[in-house]
Amino acid sequence: FFPVMVSGPILRYREDGEQFFEPHPFDYKQVTQGMQRMLWGFFKELVISERMALIVNTIYGNYEAYPGVYIWLGTVAFAFQLYTNFSGGMDIVLGLAQTFGLKLPENFRRPFFSKNISEYWRRWHISLGVWMKEYVFYPLLRSSFFTRLSKDMRKKLGKKRGKQITTFAGMFLLWFSVGIWHGGDWKYIIGSGLLHWFYIVSGELLEPWYLKCMEKLHINPKARAVDILRIVRTFFLVNIGFVFFRASSVGDAWKMLKSAATVFNPGILIGGQIFELGLDWIEFTIAVVSLLILFGVSLMQRKGDVRERIREKAMPVRWLIWYVLLFYVILLGYYGPGFSTAEFIYQGF
């Protein structure tokens, strides 16, 4: 199917194939909702991602001149650049498919709301995670080598610990493969692969200790404040991986992380320096407002399809919403003469 050939989602014939051979008569609702989703994707890509790219390129292109908080600012900007670029592309693809009456699998479910790394990968590039599990991880665990390894580890370390060690070994190869898939360079193998393996393994090993600490401190691990802290922690850990992903090399990534950890210059956030990173104050304000819109819609999506909720509004209201978004993209999007052609980052992987 032509829209998915460049950047996904990765389809599985047994789940998605039959619909390509079924008749799909014109359906006004499907066409309009598909176009609405495409518009939302263009908003993410042309209004947000392209603006974030200017900040990212300025800081990462000359990181030695932008130490400390600049590094964190550039990395957070890259997180949103990558997310809006990739998920925006998926919105365009899935929306286009919907106009033809086809339902493709979701590839993103608000990943920056994840409370741990495992959950993050169940929300980020979902089809890749499913493919890797089915065609790399499970076949590895069923292989003769891992079967023998599992038996040996269970004899030496006990049933529970032996199974855990075998699973961790399989996960190591899985995440190494994820890094290879992203490009094969060590910055991808570390930033998108092995670092996340380390996070997941560490989280599983430390979970009993974490729960005991929460119990001794009389803290409810399911409290809203705890959930917010876990979301912030997960976003922070993911951003460390993004430093490797975006840096020119592993060496540059280490230098940037060292600078981010040792130079304390939060004054740039309230001074004029922040408007010297590729966006003036007007463009920066547009970027912030657009991110707030994205955040608000993401919160609304947790309660169901936003398009369906808009569809329930009176006709003048729903048309006003979509026309405002359309003109927002037309007037504030980065496209046309004077701008670099918008590209989808994941086309390169």
Language-model segment annotations:
Residues 1-297, 301-348:
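Membrane-embedded transmembrane alpha-helical bundles that form the catalytic cores
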